[in-house]
Design a protein with these regions (language model features):
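Catalytic Tyr-X3-Lys loop
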Residues: 97-116, 131, 135, 152, ...
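Conserved glycine-rich cofactor-binding loop
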Residues: 9, 16-18
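C-terminal substrate-recognition "lid" of short-chain dehydrogenase/reductases
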Residues: 116-119, 131, 212-241, 246
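Residue(s) in the substrate-gating loop at a strand-loop-helix junction
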Residues: 139
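Short C-terminal tail/terminal secondary-structure segment
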Residues: 2, 93, 235-262
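Active-site helix of classical SDR
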Residues: 119, 155, 163
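Alpha-helical segment proximal to the catalytic Tyr-Lys
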Residues: 124, 168-172, 232
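Conserved mid-core segment of classical short-chain dehydrogenase/reductases
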Residues: 67, 90-105, 128, 148-151, ...
Length: 262
């Protein structure tokens, strides 16, 4: 282990499972002090204890909790150098015409407003230090308009726009902002596979490498690069860490219910 993040303070939302847990583990192994922000207290505490980090219970749809998360990192360690916006709570599978206002509001609260609030709260600390790294987890689903998950697709594409806009505005301050579109065994996908095991085979078959990525060994190293000193001249990008899946697009489609999503 090279200690590429030695002395840095990292905040990882959704850090109790899947990609977030993989990122938290690798960042800690590389020397960072990691705040694990998670709505599932048992999972979040377990990861934080494992890596010697700090757990904070956070619902990213609550602005006060998100701002408090950043304040806790600063109060505890004096700074926040790295922010990974990863948390997501799932979407209601259904056709566009069956989506409700509440579904869209919740999707944007999780996938757009939560990251925005965290970025807004973290930026003053990063800019004063003249150094900062923001990593937003986005999705190929938004790029290729995967059917059935409008609120997820839309929020993730809005987050890509936020990524590029912040990257342009914040570049003079030493704060770089990038996104990762992972093709990985996320917690949400695992839940969907549990309900419909055929999805796993379909997703693997559609990938040029024949498999989904592992959060720790395939996705977290990309986040490590974006969080490191090596990323000083890289900003406003989306990296597709998906085994080439973006070349094929989303080649599988779920069966959508005829009735409105519940």
């Amino acid at each position: 282990v090279s200690g590429r993040l030695e002395g840095r303070v990292a905040v990882v939302t959704g850090g109790g499972d899947g990609i977030g847990a993989g990122v938290a583990r690798l960042f800690a192994a590389e020397g960072a002090r990691v705040l694990v922000a998670e709505i599932d207290e048992a999972k979040g505490r377990a990861v934080a204890e494992e890596i010697g980090g700090l757990f904070v219970h956070v619902d990213v749809t609550d602005r006060d909790q998100v701002e408090g998360m950043i304040a806790t990192a600063v109060d505890t360690w004096g700074s926040v150098d790295i922010l990974v916006n990863n948390a997501w709570g799932g979407a209601n599978l259904g056709r566009v015409e069956h989506k409700t206002d509440e579904m869209l509001h919740r999707g944007f609260a999780m996938g757009y407003y939560g990251p925005f609030w965290a970025m807004r709260a973290a930026f003053p600390h990063m800019s004063r230090a003249g150094w900062g790294r923001v990593i937003n987890m986005v999705s190929l689903n938004g790029v290729n308009a995967h059917i059935g998950s409008l609120e997820y697709n839309s929020a993730k594409e809005a987050l890509r726009t936020l990524t590029r806009t912040a990257a342009r505005e914040w570049a003079p301050t030493g704060v770089v902002v990038n996104a990762i579109a992972p093709g990985a065994k996320t917690a949400a996908l695992q839940r969907r596979i549990a309900q419909n095991p055929d999805i796993a085979a379909a997703v693997d078959a559609a990938n040029p490498m024949g498999r989904l990525g592992d959060p720790l060994t395939d996705i977290a190293p990309v986040a490590l690069f974006l969080a490191s000193e090596d990323c000083r001249y890289v900003t406003g990008n989306t990296i597709f860490a998906d085994g080439g899946g973006h070349i094929n697009g989303v080649a599988w489609a779920p069966e959508l219910p005829d009735a409105p999503a519940g």
